Protein backbone atom coordinates (compact mmCIF):
# COMPACT_ATOMS: atom_id res chain seq x y z
CA UNK A 1 0.00 0.00 0.00
CA UNK A 2 1.35 3.44 -0.96
CA UNK A 3 1.86 5.63 2.07
CA UNK A 4 0.33 9.08 1.85
CA UNK A 5 0.43 12.50 3.46
CA UNK A 6 -2.64 14.32 4.78
CA UNK A 7 -2.48 18.13 4.76
CA UNK A 8 -5.05 20.14 6.74
CA UNK A 9 -5.34 23.88 6.13
CA UNK A 10 -4.61 25.06 2.60
CA UNK A 11 -4.84 28.82 2.97
CA UNK A 12 -2.33 31.44 1.84
CA UNK A 13 0.56 29.53 3.40
CA UNK A 14 -0.68 25.96 3.48
CA UNK A 15 -1.57 25.70 -0.19
CA UNK A 16 1.90 26.49 -1.60
CA UNK A 17 3.48 24.27 1.05
CA UNK A 18 1.24 21.40 -0.04
CA UNK A 19 2.02 22.18 -3.68
CA UNK A 20 5.73 21.73 -3.06
CA UNK A 21 5.11 18.35 -1.46
CA UNK A 22 3.03 17.31 -4.47
CA UNK A 23 5.73 18.54 -6.87
CA UNK A 24 8.25 16.41 -4.99
CA UNK A 25 6.28 13.35 -6.08
CA UNK A 26 4.64 12.54 -2.75
CA UNK A 27 1.17 11.03 -2.48
CA UNK A 28 -0.88 13.81 -0.92
CA UNK A 29 -4.48 14.68 -0.06
CA UNK A 30 -5.64 18.00 1.40
CA UNK A 31 -8.59 19.29 3.40
CA UNK A 32 -9.83 22.68 4.57
CA UNK A 33 -13.07 23.73 6.25
CA UNK A 34 -13.31 26.56 3.74
CA UNK A 35 -14.88 25.50 0.45
CA UNK A 36 -13.22 28.51 -1.17
CA UNK A 37 -9.78 27.30 -0.09
CA UNK A 38 -10.55 23.75 -1.22
CA UNK A 39 -11.58 25.02 -4.64
CA UNK A 40 -8.40 27.09 -4.82
CA UNK A 41 -6.33 24.01 -3.92
CA UNK A 42 -8.15 21.95 -6.54
CA UNK A 43 -7.27 24.57 -9.15
CA UNK A 44 -3.64 24.05 -8.16
CA UNK A 45 -4.05 20.34 -9.05
CA UNK A 46 -4.03 19.23 -5.42
CA UNK A 47 -6.19 16.22 -4.57
CA UNK A 48 -8.90 17.43 -2.19
CA UNK A 49 -11.32 15.63 0.11
CA UNK A 50 -14.51 16.93 1.73
CA UNK A 51 -14.02 15.80 5.34
CA UNK A 52 -11.45 14.76 7.93
CA UNK A 53 -12.97 11.28 7.96
CA UNK A 54 -12.25 10.98 4.26
CA UNK A 55 -8.75 12.39 4.73
CA UNK A 56 -7.49 10.21 7.59
CA UNK A 57 -7.28 6.74 6.10
CA UNK A 58 -5.17 3.71 6.99
CA UNK A 59 -2.49 4.59 4.45
CA UNK A 60 -1.72 8.01 5.98
CA UNK A 61 1.79 8.03 7.45
CA UNK A 62 2.10 11.78 8.03
CA UNK A 63 -0.37 14.52 8.93
CA UNK A 64 0.58 18.18 8.45
CA UNK A 65 -1.60 20.95 9.83
CA UNK A 66 -1.39 24.67 9.00
CA UNK A 67 -4.13 26.39 11.00
CA UNK A 68 -4.81 29.96 12.18
CA UNK A 69 -4.97 29.61 15.98
CA UNK A 70 -4.51 27.24 18.89
CA UNK A 71 -8.24 26.61 19.19
CA UNK A 72 -8.28 25.31 15.62
CA UNK A 73 -5.32 22.98 16.19
CA UNK A 74 -6.89 21.71 19.40
CA UNK A 75 -10.20 21.02 17.67
CA UNK A 76 -8.57 19.21 14.74
CA UNK A 77 -6.38 17.02 16.95
CA UNK A 78 -8.32 16.64 20.21
CA UNK A 79 -11.90 17.63 19.39
CA UNK A 80 -14.95 15.39 19.28
CA UNK A 81 -13.97 14.28 15.77
CA UNK A 82 -10.27 14.85 16.34
CA UNK A 83 -7.69 12.95 14.34
CA UNK A 84 -5.50 11.95 17.28
CA UNK A 85 -7.59 8.81 17.84
CA UNK A 86 -7.86 8.01 14.13
CA UNK A 87 -4.24 7.89 13.00
CA UNK A 88 -2.03 4.84 13.41
CA UNK A 89 0.79 4.72 15.96
CA UNK A 90 3.28 4.82 13.10
CA UNK A 91 1.90 8.15 11.90
CA UNK A 92 3.94 11.33 12.32
CA UNK A 93 2.05 14.51 13.26
CA UNK A 94 3.50 17.86 12.17
CA UNK A 95 1.72 21.01 13.32
CA UNK A 96 3.05 23.98 11.34
CA UNK A 97 0.54 26.36 12.92
CA UNK A 98 1.82 29.27 15.02
CA UNK A 99 -0.08 28.82 18.29
CA UNK A 100 0.33 29.31 22.03
CA UNK A 101 2.96 27.12 23.63
CA UNK A 102 0.57 25.62 26.20
CA UNK A 103 -1.80 24.27 23.53
CA UNK A 104 1.11 22.98 21.48
CA UNK A 105 2.45 21.02 24.45
CA UNK A 106 -1.03 19.75 25.39
CA UNK A 107 -1.62 18.29 21.94
CA UNK A 108 1.89 16.85 21.76
CA UNK A 109 1.65 15.17 25.15
CA UNK A 110 -1.64 13.52 24.22
CA UNK A 111 -0.03 12.17 21.06
CA UNK A 112 2.92 10.82 23.04
CA UNK A 113 0.55 9.12 25.50
CA UNK A 114 -0.87 7.23 22.52
CA UNK A 115 2.60 6.35 21.23
CA UNK A 116 2.42 8.78 18.31
CA UNK A 117 5.33 11.01 17.34
CA UNK A 118 4.55 14.71 17.04
CA UNK A 119 6.41 17.96 16.48
CA UNK A 120 5.41 21.60 16.47
CA UNK A 121 6.99 23.16 13.38
CA UNK A 122 5.84 26.75 12.77
CA UNK A 123 7.29 28.50 9.75
CA UNK A 124 8.64 31.92 8.85
CA UNK A 125 9.15 33.49 5.44
CA UNK A 126 5.67 34.46 4.31
CA UNK A 127 3.80 33.41 1.20
CA UNK A 128 6.83 34.04 -1.01
CA UNK A 129 8.88 31.69 1.16
CA UNK A 130 6.13 29.07 1.02
CA UNK A 131 5.93 29.34 -2.76
CA UNK A 132 9.69 29.14 -3.25
CA UNK A 133 10.19 26.46 -0.55
CA UNK A 134 12.61 28.76 1.28
CA UNK A 135 10.78 28.81 4.61
CA UNK A 136 12.55 28.81 7.94
CA UNK A 137 11.03 26.03 10.02
CA UNK A 138 11.43 25.94 13.81
CA UNK A 139 10.83 22.54 15.35
CA UNK A 140 9.94 21.45 18.86
CA UNK A 141 9.92 17.76 19.73
CA UNK A 142 12.17 14.76 20.26
CA UNK A 143 15.32 14.31 18.19
CA UNK A 144 13.85 11.07 16.83
CA UNK A 145 10.68 12.82 15.64
CA UNK A 146 12.72 15.70 14.21
CA UNK A 147 14.93 13.32 12.23
CA UNK A 148 11.90 11.47 10.90
CA UNK A 149 10.24 14.72 9.78
CA UNK A 150 13.38 16.36 8.38
CA UNK A 151 13.20 15.07 4.76
CA UNK A 152 9.61 16.28 4.43
CA UNK A 153 10.34 19.62 6.11
CA UNK A 154 13.24 20.10 3.72
CA UNK A 155 10.79 19.92 0.80
CA UNK A 156 8.91 22.91 2.22
CA UNK A 157 11.75 24.95 3.67
CA UNK A 158 15.36 25.98 3.34
CA UNK A 159 16.51 26.32 6.95
CA UNK A 160 15.25 23.70 9.39
CA UNK A 161 16.02 24.26 13.08
CA UNK A 162 15.55 21.90 16.02
CA UNK A 163 14.73 24.38 18.79
CA UNK A 164 14.21 21.85 21.59
CA UNK A 165 11.37 19.95 23.26
CA UNK A 166 7.67 20.14 22.39
CA UNK A 167 6.52 23.75 22.31
CA UNK A 168 10.00 25.11 21.63
CA UNK A 169 9.25 25.57 17.94
CA UNK A 170 6.34 27.84 18.73
CA UNK A 171 8.35 29.61 21.41
CA UNK A 172 11.11 30.39 18.92
CA UNK A 173 8.60 31.48 16.27
CA UNK A 174 6.81 33.81 18.69
CA UNK A 175 10.12 35.46 19.63
CA UNK A 176 11.02 35.81 15.95
CA UNK A 177 7.69 37.37 15.00
CA UNK A 178 7.78 39.82 17.87
CA UNK A 179 11.12 41.05 16.48
CA UNK A 180 9.62 41.10 12.97
CA UNK A 181 6.64 43.21 14.01
CA UNK A 182 8.93 45.70 15.75
CA UNK A 183 11.25 45.77 12.72
CA UNK A 184 8.39 46.43 10.28
CA UNK A 185 7.27 49.42 12.35
CA UNK A 186 10.88 50.66 12.51
CA UNK A 187 11.29 50.29 8.74
CA UNK A 188 8.04 52.18 8.18
CA UNK A 189 9.09 54.98 10.53
CA UNK A 190 12.48 55.35 8.83
CA UNK A 191 11.18 55.39 5.26
CA UNK A 192 8.32 57.74 6.06
CA UNK A 193 10.71 60.09 7.87
CA UNK A 194 12.84 60.15 4.72
CA UNK A 195 9.71 60.99 2.74
CA UNK A 196 8.88 63.89 5.07
CA UNK A 197 12.46 65.10 4.64
CA UNK A 198 11.93 65.05 0.86
CA UNK A 199 14.74 62.54 0.32
CA UNK A 200 14.37 60.06 -2.55
CA UNK A 201 12.83 56.93 -0.99
CA UNK A 202 14.57 54.59 -3.43
CA UNK A 203 17.95 56.06 -2.56
CA UNK A 204 17.30 55.84 1.18
CA UNK A 205 16.13 52.25 0.74
CA UNK A 206 19.32 51.34 -1.14
CA UNK A 207 21.43 53.02 1.54
CA UNK A 208 19.65 51.19 4.37
CA UNK A 209 19.99 47.83 2.59
CA UNK A 210 23.76 48.29 2.65
CA UNK A 211 24.15 50.03 5.99
CA UNK A 212 23.66 49.23 9.67
CA UNK A 213 19.93 50.01 9.47
CA UNK A 214 19.25 46.96 7.32
CA UNK A 215 16.61 44.42 8.34
CA UNK A 216 14.37 41.81 6.71
CA UNK A 217 11.56 44.35 6.16
CA UNK A 218 14.06 46.66 4.46
CA UNK A 219 15.97 44.15 2.33
CA UNK A 220 13.22 41.66 1.46
CA UNK A 221 9.75 42.97 2.35
CA UNK A 222 9.68 46.79 2.30
CA UNK A 223 6.51 48.52 3.54
CA UNK A 224 6.37 51.07 0.71
CA UNK A 225 5.63 50.34 -2.97
CA UNK A 226 8.11 50.73 -5.78
CA UNK A 227 11.10 49.29 -3.94
CA UNK A 228 11.10 45.51 -4.53
CA UNK A 229 9.01 43.72 -7.17
CA UNK A 230 6.61 41.02 -6.03
CA UNK A 231 6.09 42.33 -2.51
CA UNK A 232 2.62 43.00 -1.04
CA UNK A 233 3.32 46.74 -0.96
CA UNK A 234 3.46 46.57 -4.77
CA UNK A 235 0.14 44.72 -4.90
CA UNK A 236 -2.16 47.01 -2.93
CA UNK A 237 -1.05 45.21 0.25
CA UNK A 238 -2.72 41.96 -0.69
CA UNK A 239 -1.61 39.79 2.22
CA UNK A 240 1.28 37.45 2.21
CA UNK A 241 1.15 37.67 6.00
CA UNK A 242 -1.83 39.67 7.22
CA UNK A 243 -1.88 42.40 9.85
CA UNK A 244 -4.39 40.27 11.73
CA UNK A 245 -1.95 37.36 11.90
CA UNK A 246 0.86 39.64 13.06
CA UNK A 247 -1.45 41.05 15.71
CA UNK A 248 -2.22 37.49 16.84
CA UNK A 249 1.48 36.64 17.10
CA UNK A 250 2.26 39.82 19.04
CA UNK A 251 -0.53 38.89 21.47
CA UNK A 252 1.04 35.45 21.86
CA UNK A 253 4.41 37.09 22.56
CA UNK A 254 2.85 39.45 25.09
CA UNK A 255 1.12 36.55 26.85
CA UNK A 256 4.39 34.58 26.91
CA UNK A 257 6.24 37.56 28.36
CA UNK A 258 3.66 37.93 31.13
CA UNK A 259 3.85 34.22 31.96
CA UNK A 260 7.60 34.38 32.63
CA UNK A 261 7.79 37.99 33.91
CA UNK A 262 9.85 39.14 30.92
CA UNK A 263 10.06 42.84 30.06
CA UNK A 264 9.20 43.45 26.39
CA UNK A 265 8.33 47.17 26.12
CA UNK A 266 8.83 47.38 22.35
CA UNK A 267 6.85 44.20 21.82
CA UNK A 268 4.02 45.63 23.89
CA UNK A 269 4.10 48.89 21.93
CA UNK A 270 4.10 47.00 18.61
CA UNK A 271 1.04 45.06 19.80
CA UNK A 272 -0.77 48.30 20.65
CA UNK A 273 0.00 49.73 17.19
CA UNK A 274 -1.09 46.61 15.28
CA UNK A 275 -4.12 46.08 17.48
CA UNK A 276 -5.40 49.58 16.73
CA UNK A 277 -4.60 49.13 13.03
CA UNK A 278 -6.70 45.96 12.93
CA UNK A 279 -9.56 47.56 14.85
CA UNK A 280 -9.69 50.20 12.12
CA UNK A 281 -10.54 47.47 9.61
CA UNK A 282 -7.09 46.68 8.22
CA UNK A 283 -6.70 43.15 9.60
CA UNK A 284 -6.91 41.51 6.16
CA UNK A 285 -4.27 43.78 4.64
CA UNK A 286 -0.64 42.71 4.64
CA UNK A 287 1.19 43.53 7.86
CA UNK A 288 3.52 45.84 5.92
CA UNK A 289 0.54 48.18 5.40
CA UNK A 290 1.21 49.38 8.95
CA UNK A 291 3.23 52.08 7.18
CA UNK A 292 -0.12 53.76 6.47
CA UNK A 293 -0.45 54.50 10.19
CA UNK A 294 3.18 55.56 10.50
CA UNK A 295 2.93 57.81 7.46
CA UNK A 296 0.32 60.24 8.73
CA UNK A 297 -0.16 63.18 6.38
CA UNK A 298 2.92 62.14 4.38
CA UNK A 299 1.13 59.00 3.14
CA UNK A 300 0.25 59.17 -0.54
CA UNK A 301 -0.04 55.44 -1.31
CA UNK A 302 -3.81 54.82 -0.97
CA UNK A 303 -5.02 51.32 -0.19
CA UNK A 304 -8.58 50.10 -0.71
PLM feature spans:
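NAD(P)+-binding Rossmann beta1-loop-alpha1 motif at the extreme N-terminus of oxidoreductases
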Residues: 1-58, 62-66, 91, 127, ...
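Rossmann-fold dinucleotide-binding core
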Residues: 8-10, 76, 99-177
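Hydrophobic beta-strand scaffold residues
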Residues: 28, 48, 118-119, 160, ...
Amino acid sequence: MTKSIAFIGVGNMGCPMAENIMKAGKSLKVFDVSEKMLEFAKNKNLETVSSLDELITVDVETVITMLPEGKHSKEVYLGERGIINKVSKNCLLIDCSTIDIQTSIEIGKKALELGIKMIDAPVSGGVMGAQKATLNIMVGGSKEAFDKAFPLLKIMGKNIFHAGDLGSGNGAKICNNMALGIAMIAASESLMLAKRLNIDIKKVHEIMKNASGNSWPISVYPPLPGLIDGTPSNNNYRPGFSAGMMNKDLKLANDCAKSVNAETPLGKMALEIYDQFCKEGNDTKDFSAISKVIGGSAWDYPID
